[in-house]
Amino acid sequence: MTQDEMKKAAGWAALKYVEKDSIVGVGTGSTVNHFIDALATMKADIEGAVSSSEASTQKMKALGIPVYDLNSVDRLSVYVDGADEINDHMDMIKGGGAALTREKIVAAVAEKFICIVDNTKQVDILGEFPLPVEVIPMARSYVARQLVKLGGDPVYREGVVTDNGNVILDVYNLKILNPKELESQINEIVGVVTNGLFAKRGADVLLVGTPDGVKTFTAK
């Protein structure tokens, strides 16, 4: 089974968590694209979706899935999204696709976070994948200096502007032993919008595409 086939299996497996007549939170990325394809097969049974990125919004609209503004929605039963890394405690690094702030907002609203990945994304310790930090443009250099003090090597992701009009610093060489603490420390830096650690709001269910099929893990 190829990596993409494992992603597809995880994406389709998430369908069983979608409630009839509900509005579904939808994330961003290659694995989520498979979930969107799956969601389109039951679009008549759901009210619609809330999206964490312009890319996902466009794909869903093209498939005929109604997309709502989050401000007009009172309840999201589930949020389905991928991760760049996830550990055994359901802490994640996300934001490789630069949609981390909107992803974090939608995740905060949802009652249940379903994370869909292939088995290459499971790790013991977070940090091999660079940690994305969304930054107000004028604060970029200041924030980078503060991130160095925390032990990281920040690199400006050139040519990338987020859907919110901000820039991304990718922080390398962090061995993240306490994800919740680091998430708070980085978010307290003036000029940071948010960072790609999803530890305070981790996943509730993890669906992992493997060569032997989809494995399900539940937060303890």
UniProtKB/Swiss-Prot annotation:
User: What's the EC number here?
Assistant: 5.3.1.6
Q: Where is the active site?
A: E103
Q: In which pathway does it act?
A: Carbohydrate degradation; pentose phosphate pathway; D-ribose 5-phosphate from D-ribulose 5-phosphate (non-oxidative stage): step 1/1
Keywords tagged on the record: Isomerase
Reaction(s) catalysed by this chain, per the record, are: aldehydo-D-ribose 5-phosphate = D-ribulose 5-phosphate
GO CC terms for this protein? cytosol
The top EC class, named as a word, is isomerase
Molecular function terms from GO: ribose-5-phosphate isomerase activity
NCBIfam families tied to this protein: PRK00702.1, rpiA
Give the quaternary structure.
Homodimer.
Protein name according to UniProt: Ribose-5-phosphate isomerase A
Q: What is the lineage of its organism?
A: Bacteria, Pseudomonadati, Pseudomonadota, Gammaproteobacteria, Alteromonadales
